[in-house]
């Protein structure tokens, strides 16, 4: 049997690092609940045929976060169908095309009663590329040793096209911190830093009594429109035409990997708007 998570000794307690792959984090973390998560995923994989196990293990362990998330959704859907005592075929063949949907559900006479396709709404590729370039900057600042009671607020005010040299940036930040604490003992001071074609804004908060493990205590993210119904509609439009006319019901499962859906009400609202227009 192919396993995504092998039985190894794990002692890591730290949270996920900026730029770290989800698989690496979930494979190493020893916090409460993570053993159970790994056990669930391995059990779901064991329900697949051997060839399908190898494919999804390779995709989730060697690919990026998109591949990990999409594989996780596929496993969850397959396990849910199995839990309903349904007979499921993975990647069933279709006449007249080499394309294969994710699943087919069979009745008692082994006739296909439904095809199921899983898709994930992801952030744009540009966002992923920017995050990968930013990760070394963030992690270098996060590892700065601050005095007791100090912590950074962190924001990217202009993203660059490449990762800049880090040593001059960290040296500049260290000097600013020391000067701010001794010359301007205020609870909050702010400064912008230029590193290559990147522009960062740091807030230095001081006056507390805790020794923080990490230098960055809060971050500001990009502000953008939240329009999950548009993403749902786009996913439905693309997948609805993928296999042409089918002789059975066709169900499209859309997973949100952009963090736009916040609960049952927002999901229902987004789905209603998407389907009404679609």
Give names to the regions the model predicted.
Residues 1-71, 75, 125-169:
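Interdomain/boundary linker segments immediately adjacent to catalytic/signaling cores
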Residues 45-54, 81, 86-91, 103:
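Surface segments flanking catalytic/ligand-binding clefts of nucleic-acid enzymes
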Residues 48, 121-278:
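Metal-dependent nuclease catalytic core centered on acidic motifs
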Residues 74-95, 218:
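Extended, Lys/Arg-enriched charged tracts that mediate electrostatic binding to polyanionic substrates
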Residues 88, 98-102, 233-240:
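Short alpha-helical segments and helix-capping/turn motifs at coil-helix boundaries
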Residues 91-93, 97-108, 112-118:
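Short acidic loop-to-beta-strand element that houses the catalytic metal-binding Asp/Glu
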């Amino acid at each position: 049997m192919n396993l995504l998570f092998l039985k190894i000794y794990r002692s890591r307690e730290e949270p996920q690092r900026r730029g770290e792959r989800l698989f690496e984090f979930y494979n190493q973390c020893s916090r409460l609940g993570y053993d159970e998560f790994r056990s669930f995923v391995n059990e779901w994989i064991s329900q697949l045929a051997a060839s399908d196990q190898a494919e999804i293990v390779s995709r989730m362990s060697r690919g990026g976060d998109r591949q990990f998330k999409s594989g996780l959704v596929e496993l969850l859907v397959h396990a849910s169908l199995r839990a309903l005592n349904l007979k499921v075929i993975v990647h069933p063949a279709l006449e007249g095309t080499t394309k294969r949907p994710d699943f087919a559900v069979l009745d008692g006479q082994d006739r296909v009663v439904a095809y199921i396709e899983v898709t994930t709404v992801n952030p744009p590729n540009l966002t992923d590329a920017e995050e990968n370039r930013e990760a070394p900057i963030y992690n270098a600042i996060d590892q700065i040793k601050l005095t007791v009671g100090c912590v950074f607020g962190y924001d990217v005010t202009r993203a660059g096209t490449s990762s800049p040299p880090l040593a001059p940036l960290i040296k500049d930040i260290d000097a600013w911190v020391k000067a701010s604490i001794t010359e301007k003992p205020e609870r909050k001071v702010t400064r912008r830093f230029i590193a290559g074609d990147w522009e960062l804004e740091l807030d230095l908060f001081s006056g507390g009594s805790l020794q923080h493990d990490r230098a960055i205590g809060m971050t500001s993210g990009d502000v953008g429109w939240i329009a999950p119904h548009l993403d749902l509609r786009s996913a439905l439009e693309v997948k609805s035409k993928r296999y042409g006319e089918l002789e059975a019901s066709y169900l499209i499962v859309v997973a949100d990997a952009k963090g736009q859906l916040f609960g049952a009400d927002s999901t229902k609202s987004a789905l209603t708007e998407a389907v009404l227009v679609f």
